[in-house]
């Protein structure tokens, strides 16, 4: 959430930044006007409360002197009525301010490229060269069915579209991948967490999914619970409402969890395969950092995600997302896209973001600076390390062989009992 004081004092700069994210200046002008009304009403109510205190003292003195205080009592009752009217106006204005400020996206960092959509993202670097095949390649969904390791038909029967069963060596490959990913992140100083797979609405607000993106989630009717769309939500909210000792920062968390997405608005997109599912595993990275180090931490986090792809020897590229393509809470985001041969393109497999103090303000996550003893908002970062199902898709396609088998990447073989190939059964 943005700082209302910052909008008030640096209106033009904030408006210019938010314009690049599709927010009209009229919205901010309305917000500014409401803020001015609110502050004026606060002055009025404080003046009336001061008058009420004077009237109360006059009544007490009159009673001590056994004098008639009926006029003072009438005056105080009128003051109380006026205060009540203003308080009601303040409550309405506060609600209007909240309805606007809670759906404003984060302001982009100065280094973020300005653009409207994914076409304006900027490629930063590439790693690895896509393999040149001398045979007709198959898509990962065809490979998965032929190898008897992925079963969409029964997934659709048991649940519905965009669900599947991993089976046999498919299940082992998935498990090997997320164990490998977690082990690599632990080497980089991350603490492993197994979080709840349901969170409450306050947690969804804290990380920015609520109120704006409720349609993208699965809520449990009649409860305060939501199935997590990403482990970012429980991991970040671990410290919601807390004050952390500054000496403990930075703090790194990692977790493997299922992620649940309604995929609202994705009808007709990626209807086959592992790219877009309602339920998928993802290894998440979350960091809590001081503001002065958070952008160094973003580079490290991105490198952590890249390290996984490099160890798996999967070609990828890194993009700096433009202002129009970044997520709601992000101030800066790098996307990692892995090469998918059957689609002859790169597809997103990780997104690493610095939200600065945007989530911390919503969730009230603060730290006590050991230098001056002051309590301040910290910066939160999050990133995929990696999306497991999409990594399975990339391995199946990049490591496929002419005979229909798939070579298991070397780094995963210790996790799969030394197996080197997934062969047709």
From Swiss-Prot:
L-serine binds at residues 230-232, 284, 384. One of its GO terms (biological process) is selenocysteine biosynthetic process. It is an enzyme of class 6 (ligase). It is found in: Cytoplasm. Its EC number is 6.1.1.11. Coiled coil: none annotated. It holds the Pfam family Seryl_tRNA_N. Catalyzes the attachment of serine to tRNA(Ser). Is also able to aminoacylate tRNA(Sec) with serine, to form the misacylated tRNA L-seryl-tRNA(Sec), which will be further converted into selenocysteinyl-tRNA(Sec). Consists of two distinct domains, a catalytic core and a N-terminal extension that is involved in tRNA binding. This is Serine--tRNA ligase.
């Amino acid at each position: 959430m943005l700082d209302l004081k910052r909008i008030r004092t640096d209106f033009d700069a904030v408006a210019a930044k938010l314009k690049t994210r599709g927010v009209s200046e009229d919205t901010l002008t309305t917000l500014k006007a409401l803020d001015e009304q609110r502050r004026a009403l606060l002055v009025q109510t404080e003046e009336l409360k001061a008058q009420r205190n004077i009237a109360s003292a006059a009544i007490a003195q009159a009673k001590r002197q056994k004098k008639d205080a009926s006029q003072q009592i009438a005056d105080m009752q009128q003051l109380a009525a006026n205060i009540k009217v203003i308080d009601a106006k303040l409550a309405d204005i506060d609600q209007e301010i909240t309805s606007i400020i809670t759906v404003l996206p984060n302001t982009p960092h100065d280094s973020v490229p300005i653009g409207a959509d994914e076409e304006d993202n900027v490629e930063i670097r590439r790693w690895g060269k896509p393999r040149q095949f001398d045979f007709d390649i198959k898509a990962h969904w065809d490979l998965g069915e032929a190898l008897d390791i992925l079963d969409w038909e029964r997934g659709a029967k048991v649940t519905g579209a965009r669900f599947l069963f991993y089976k046999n060596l498919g299940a082992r490959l998935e498990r090997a991948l997320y164990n490998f990913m977690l082990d690599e992140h632990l080497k980089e100083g991350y603490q492993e967490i197994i979080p709840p797979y349901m969170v409450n609405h306050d947690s969804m607000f804290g990380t920015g999914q609520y109120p704006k993106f409720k349609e993208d989630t699965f809520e449990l009717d009649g409860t305060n619970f939501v199935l997590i769309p990403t482990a970012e939500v429980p991991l970040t909210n671990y410290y919601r409402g807390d004050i952390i000792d500054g000496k403990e920062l930075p703090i790194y968390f990692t977790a493997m969890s299922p992620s649940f997405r309604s995929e609202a608005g994705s009808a007709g997109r990626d209807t086959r395969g592992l790219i877009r599912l309602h339920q998928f595993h993802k290894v998440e990275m979350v960091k809590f950092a001081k503001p002065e180090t958070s952008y160094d931490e973003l580079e490290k986090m991105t490198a952590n995600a890249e390290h996984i792809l490099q160890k798996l020897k999967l070609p990828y590229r890194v993009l700096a997302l433009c202002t129009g393509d970044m997520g709601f809470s992000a101030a800066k985001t790098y996307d990692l896209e892995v090469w998918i041969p059957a689609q002859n393109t790169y597809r997103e497999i990780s997104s690493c973001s610095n939200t600065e103090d945007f989530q911390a303000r919503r969730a009230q996550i603060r730290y006590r600076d050991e230098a001056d003893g002051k309590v301040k908002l910290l910066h939160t970062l999050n990133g995929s390390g990696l999306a497991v199902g999409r990594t399975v898709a990339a391995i199946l396609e990049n490591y496929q062989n002419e005979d229909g088998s798939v070579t298991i990447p070397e780094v995963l073989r210790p996790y799969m009992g030394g197996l080197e190939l997934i062969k047709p059964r």
